[in-house]
């Protein structure tokens, strides 16, 4: 409601979407640009996928438990010729968003791919984005690991993978792109103390070549390099530690990516096991020994972040070693040359 009030008062120059999550529910807000907006509460058993396009459709002004909107959302659309009641019920997407040729390659494939990942038997066609369901119930519960995989998707295993095929002109825009600055996953577990129940997983840079690191709400300090990072590479920046590695991998994706991805997969699996052990120990301590529980959590954070950066530097050095050897072989000028 606060963001909606700002949109109504100040306006928005373009469409955007924002998710809100707490211990009870998730809401998703989209703007219609200008001073119009719509927010919908996600059904408890459903998930929502969005690319760079408005996706919300249905609006029930009488259902305050599941919908919030700008007061003139429907009347403005009618006045401006964006909605004709004679043609059926109000559709937010049809009134305030669009489906054009660019969407068929830039947006539709991403939504279609993830919906089919969580609902493999879905019969939608990738080129018909206007038919995609807004909300879907997955065939199995979606885990944090599944969300990581989703955000790393680049159509691997298909002809649309731009990295494996060395094709920067691939029409389908992948989910994982090099220009990603950070990728975030928010997890709220209401049955746990907030200190460990609320976790933000952050991957610095390109998700498919990065590692998702767990930042617990209860941590008290970060690593020294976490607050450093500009558009200039630097050795003391956490961001650039991972970004440098990704830049090197992209010089020969097929040669370097498999080892890096395997290393991060192993690291995340090991970290997940360590998280579980830490959380169990925290639960045994936090009521009677809160300071000890806090130290336990902080020590886990410090060790995890330090180990991730150490691994990133080792992987970087491995690639530099290989590239140095290649360069030497290419420009060796051996004395035995004819």
Stretches found by the model and what they are:
Residues 2-58:
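Catalytic cofactor-binding cores of redox enzymes
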């Amino acid at each position: 409601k606060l963001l909606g009030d700002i949109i109504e008062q100040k306006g928005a120059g373009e469409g955007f979407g924002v998710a809100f999550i707490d211990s009870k529910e998730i809401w998703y807000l989209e703007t219609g640009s200008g001073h119009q907006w719509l927010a919908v509460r996600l059904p408890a058993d459903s998930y929502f996928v969005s690319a760079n396009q408005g996706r919300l459709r249905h609006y029930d002004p009488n259902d305050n438990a599941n919908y919030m909107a700008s007061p003139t959302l429907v009347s403005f659309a009618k006045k401006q010729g964006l909605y004709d009641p004679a043609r059926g019920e109000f559709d937010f997407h049809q009134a305030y968003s669009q489906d054009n040729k660019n969407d068929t390659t830039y947006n539709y494939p991403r939504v279609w791919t993830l919906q089919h990942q969580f609902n493999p038997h879905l019969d939608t066609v990738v080129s018909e984005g206007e038919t995609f369901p807004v909300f879907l119930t997955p065939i199995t519960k979606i885990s944090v690991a599944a969300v990581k995989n989703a955000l790393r998707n680049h159509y691997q295993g298909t002809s649309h993978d731009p990295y494996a095929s060395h094709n920067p002109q691939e029409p389908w825009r992948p989910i994982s792109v090099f220009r990603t600055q950070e990728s975030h996953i928010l997890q709220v577990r209401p049955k746990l103390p907030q200190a460990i129940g609320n976790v933000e997983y952050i991957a610095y840079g390109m998700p498919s070549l990065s590692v998702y690191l767990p930042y617990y709400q209860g941590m008290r300090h970060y690593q020294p390099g976490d607050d450093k990072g500009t558009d200039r590479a630097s050795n003391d920046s956490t961001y650039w530690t991972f970004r440098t590695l990704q830049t090197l991998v992209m010089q020969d994706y097929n040669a370097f990516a498999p080892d890096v991805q395997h290393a991060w997969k192993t690291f995340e699996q090991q970290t997940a096991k360590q998280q579980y052990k830490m959380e169990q120990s925290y639960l045994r301590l936090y009521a009677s020994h809160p300071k000890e529980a806090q130290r336990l959590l902080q020590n886990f954070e410090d060790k995890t972040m330090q180990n991730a950066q150490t691994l990133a530097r080792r992987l970087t050095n491995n690639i530099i070693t290989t590239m140095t050897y290649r360069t030497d072989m290419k420009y060796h000028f051996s004395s035995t040359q004819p």
